[in-house]
From Swiss-Prot:
Pfam families: DAP_epimerase (PF01678). Belongs to the diaminopimelate epimerase family. PROSITE patterns: DAP_EPIMERASE (PS01326). This is Diaminopimelate epimerase. Substrate binds at residues 13, 46, 66, 76-77, 170, 203, 221-222, 231-232. It comes from Acidovorax ebreus (strain TPSY) (Diaphorobacter sp. (strain TPSY)).
Length: 292
């Protein structure tokens, strides 16, 4: 199969974007994995697909596949690239669009300075809805938030972490660290991601508080490993920090790929807003093997 694609990145989180507004490509999980492969394919953290409106009041459908070929609910950095793509390709003339995802409707807005702000919707803090299994666990309360003990099997020390659990349409476990540069992301990230208390697996966030308006963050993403940035991870980390009484309503999030701005008023019904860059890297064509 011969297809056209666009390579994009948002704060270093990189994507292959596919246009299915004129018809479905019908790719298999193995073909998505091929596209994401950095040696044999194009290379990307996720594959983003643009599909036509699925219903009234919606402009587009936004479909996300991780590098492992699995479909996921949400990707914040990808949402910014999605909005930039449909505008640059002439698929819309609107500055604000309404986009259907597996997790619900989001509303990216292209700002005058070239960045994109995305209304990421309301965070979910009820553990069962993240989902996170709290059976037999007692939370540690801090501020208006909670941290939950998470025992990591297979660690020499049988370490127990304290994590705040948040869903931004996809599940996140956020832990506070003194220094993200020395955090054991490669060692504990896979253990947290596949921990049995997270039945849908989880994105593991490592959050360093610099001050009440500035943090540093690394994320080991479910199905992708550590990425240079994770938009929903930044949202979840800031929500956790605000609930724990550590952060103000606007926070600058330094990722390894760039800077994101997260705004949240702090109420359970308040949406989280994420602002950051979205850049086209190159356009291309590729032959995808039919049998993989």
């Amino acid at each position: 199969m011969h297809i056209r694609f666009t390579k994009m990145q948002g704060a270093g989180n990189d994507f292959v974007v596919l246009d299915e507004t004129q018809g479905r490509l019908g790719l298999t999980p193995a073909q998505y994995r091929f596209l994401a492969d950095r040696h044999f394919g194009v290379g990307a953290d996720q594959i983003l697909t643009v599909r036509p409106s699925p219903g009234a009041g919606i402009d587009f459908e936004y479909v996300i596949h991780n590098a492992d070929g699995g479909q996921v609910e949400q990707c914040g950095n990808g949402a910014r690239c999605f909005a930039r793509y449909v505008r640059d390709k002439g698929l819309t003339a609107q500055d604000t669009i309404r986009v259907q995802t597996m997790a619900g409707v989001i509303a990216p807005h292209l700002t005058a300075d070239g960045r994109v702000t995305v209304d990421m919707g309301r965070p979910e803090l009820e553990p069962a809805r993240v989902p996170f299994d709290t059976t037999g666990l007692a939370p540690v309360s801090q501020g208006s938030g909670q941290k939950w003990p998470l025992a990591l099997d297979g660690q020499a020390s049988e370490a127990t972490l304290l994590v705040a659990v948040v869903s931004m349409g996809n599940p996140h476990a956020v832990q506070l660290v003194d220094d993200v540069d020395t955090a054991p992301v490669a060692q504990t990230g896979p253990l947290i991601e596949s921990h049995p208390r997270f039945p849908q697996r989880v994105n593991a966030g490592y959050l360093q508080i610099v001050n009440r308006g500035e943090v540093r963050l690394r994320v080991y993403e479910r199905g992708a490993g550590e990425t240079l940035a994770c938009g929903t991870g930044a949202c979840a980390a800031v929500v956790a920090g605000i609930r724990l009484g550590l952060l103000d309503a606007r926070v600058q999030v330094h990722t390894r790929g760039g800077l994101l701005t997260i705004d949240w008023a702090g109420g359970l019904q308040d949406p989280v807003f994420m602002t950051g860059p979205a850049t086209t890297v190159f356009e291309g064509e590729i032959d995808i093997p039919d049998a993989l």
